[in-house]
Amino acid sequence: MRRKTSRQSPLKLISLNELLRPGASPDQSSSLPQRTAGRLARRAEAWHLENAALSLKLNFAYQRAGDAPIPGALVEVCGHLITSKDAPLKPHEFSVNSIEFLHRPQLAEPALSARRASRLAEAVALRARSNRDIRAFFDARDFLEVETPNWVEAAGTDVHLSPVSASFQDPHRSAKDAIHGQLHTSPEFSMKRLLAAGMERIWQMTKVWRNGEITPLHNPEFTLLEWYRAWEGLDAIINDVEHLSRVLLGNQARVGERAISLEAPFLRMTMQQVIEEACGFDILEATEFDALLAICTERKLLSENSLNRARKLHRWDELFFELEIDYIDPFLGTKGAVFVCDWPTPLAVLARTKPEDPRVAQRFELYIGGVELANGFQELTDPAEQRRRFEADLTARKAAGLPLPPMPERFLEALQWGLPPSSGVALGVDRFLMLKSGAEHIREVAPFAMARDPKTGKASWS
């Protein structure tokens, strides 16, 4: 496929990044011939040489049969930079003296191509900068970065999460000896085992998987940042989250076209206050299914379909999640940056209850512009109570006809050994990148995120 249209230049090949970087060295001035490379693209009636982040207009100063530019071709070009009078130090275009075709495209432009990559280049660079900032944030606070397995024996019992199954088959043993596991939905169980082993301040940024979730805010695989403080309360973690939010977002977040100021201290509300304002009743007087169903029915808060579905399952949390979609999320969308604290106990399987009010769990979530970003607990350390809650989850899963995952016995053993009083939080990195860039879909900040056909609903790989 390679064809040279001129003798190979003895000039050193200079990347577009180096050629166009601010403050280029004298040997990259417009008076000297240059050799660079990239992909050809047609833009606004002109040819350009591009990579994911940069585009340089080309001026073909010669005519030669067979040298016609080809959209998408990978090429090397030799010639001179041309600068404008108004910006003598900023290259305006490149006068091409010779061109070498390295590869001609053999198919139509793929989904992940130079054209799409050019739109994602800023987001990819933003992720790299954010990763550096996150690491510096925790280094400055004497946290230890840890790595735990992505493939685990038991990912959890949560009724509302569906783990991705994964198995190991030794080719030299029979199928009955296969080891069955799951891709973790969170590193929480493994990290708490490290807390029980004596580690006190730990953090991790990792990929996690949750089956079935493909929306503008969800992808089956996403990046989760999780950290824990042993011997410290929930206020310390909440302060961490607020400080890190400003490190990652600065003084402003963007939800699509909407700008949200982060200059003022983040608002704090209890879930009781949120529901009182959004729905007009006291959720702590309705922590049993029949009581909440009666309120939703009498006040006509939910549709008959939603009420009937909840009646069939006899699940308090189903009623709550319907209220969340119809009332709570829209209400929080009007509040800028807000920590929602003190959740009803049925919504916090892994959190401690408040000693003064067992109806309330020591849980918080951070919302900015109505987007849920972080979820934290004062961690439950009682192994018997934790097992009871897991068993209740499994009972609910069975009633709903859902698969029954294994009990997380190794995590429960760590609780039996002794988990120190601890607080922790999980934060969605991709969503923070969306709020930094104003992206409206997770695919804009995660180039390989899965897609769902809007007509058929079918999911597909990128």
Residues covered by each model-derived region:
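Class II aminoacyl-tRNA synthetase-like tRNA-binding/catalytic domains
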Residues: 2-236, 244-246, 329, 434, ...
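Short, glycine/acidic-rich hinge or "gate" loops at secondary-structure transitions
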Residues: 147-151, 251-263
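A translation/RNA-centric and nucleic-acid-associated enzymatic feature enriched
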Residues: 149-240, 269-462
